[in-house]
Amino acid sequence: MARLIAAAVLALSGAAAQAADFALLRWTEDHRDLADPAHQATPLDGLKHIALGDDSAHYLSLGGQLRLKGLSLDAPLFGLGAAGADGYWFQRLNLHGDWHAGPHLRVFVEIGDARVHGKDAPATIVDANRADLQLAFADFNVEIAGNPLLLRLGRQELAFDNWQRFVAVREGPNVRRAFDGVRLIGSVGGYELTAFAMDAVANRNDEAFDDRDNPGLQFSGLRIRSGSAGTKYLDGYWYRYSRADAPFGGMRAQERRDAFGLQSAGRLGRFDWDAEAQYQVGEFGDSDIRAWAIGNVFGYSFPGPAWKPRLSLQLDAASGDRHAGDDRLETFNPLFSRGSYFSQSGLTDFSNLVNTGLFLSVRPTSPLTLGFGGGRMARQTRADAAYAQPLLPIPRSTIADKHIGDYWRFNASYRCNRHLTLSSELLHYVPSAGLREVGADTVHYAEVVAKLLF
């Protein structure tokens, strides 16, 4: 495998100043510039725009991704659960085709194959999923009274912002998250509107092409954006989350949440920010749901051309259940959150939490980015547990004090060329004295990732 990566580096090396970069959401890419052979810097660039007619609106774009990720975690759940230390590696291969049949019709299909190797614990649905339909949707573009409207039908991903706090594609694990349903995107009077109604896709991994929609986990909503994602914007949204047979506090029942949120992000001079607040109401069985969360990242980029240092402050909080056994559930559900929001380790989830972190990133050279920082985590209320991903109560954590622990994190990313990126993360997490008294261990997590995009 190392020889394959090395060969790819040589084959795909070369300047590509005029070619568009690859995106986390591959269906957002626009490679029409590569219709000109003069802009094709690598052998695979010719696949990005295959003309299907005499005009530029009819073409096929082919692409894919190969990702290798090795990781080691020595104390899952701080050593308080049944699982022990483990180290293993992921292999993910995705291939897609993007057919544009004129200005009004587009079809995007992606096949994904995800494997896990060397894991001692049983593989989960986010670890492995043999060849299956990752994405398959059709876009229909029309204009109504001069305003553009896009209708998207089929299997698709949802992500509305860069941080992806509560709705994310789940890039960190091996199997990305998808939904089956319908989405409408329109613009009118300087506002962008998005409406959707979806069933989550159930990843099965029993055999190839066995994934199905899961009507027991439904997600719908409406978002309204004022401004541009490239500068400053303000979003208001409503989500409806409905899950049959959801687990909470040792019980299982129907869970329905209506989430109302505001999010603002942008840049002003050397300052940047991303701030979000969400309030949830609903029912879990016979209990009423009242929960909340806030997430904030504030950054400052220092002047000067050398190393491009950026200092960021992260302030987050999410409610926990203050009175177990009553008729109200106050534990915040982070819905379809980005698992790597705090770190890639999955040690903590965005529930019953107060997090404060400070991080510094630098770029010693143009392709190399380094980041280092740390923070402190505590439970928002002592009556509720600390939670690991995905919304798993950490055993015996309700016995300890509010303080969960202190962590230090180091990240490195090296962009070899337009196609290949190497990255790593190291985490050192020291549990609080209260958690250590009930048996918690210090946690060390490490990962290395090679990602090849074309």
Predicted regions and their residues:
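Extracellular/periplasmic loop regions
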Residues: 21-41, 250, 287-398
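Predominantly the C-terminal beta-signal and adjacent terminal strand-loop region
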Residues: 417-449, 453
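Surface-exposed loop and membrane-interface regions of Gram-negative outer-membrane beta-barrel proteins
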Residues: 72-91, 99-147, 160, 164-169, ...
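Bacterial N-terminal signal peptides
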Residues: 6-13
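Signature for the C-terminal beta-barrel architecture of outer-membrane proteins
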Residues: 144-151, 165-325, 398, 404-408, ...
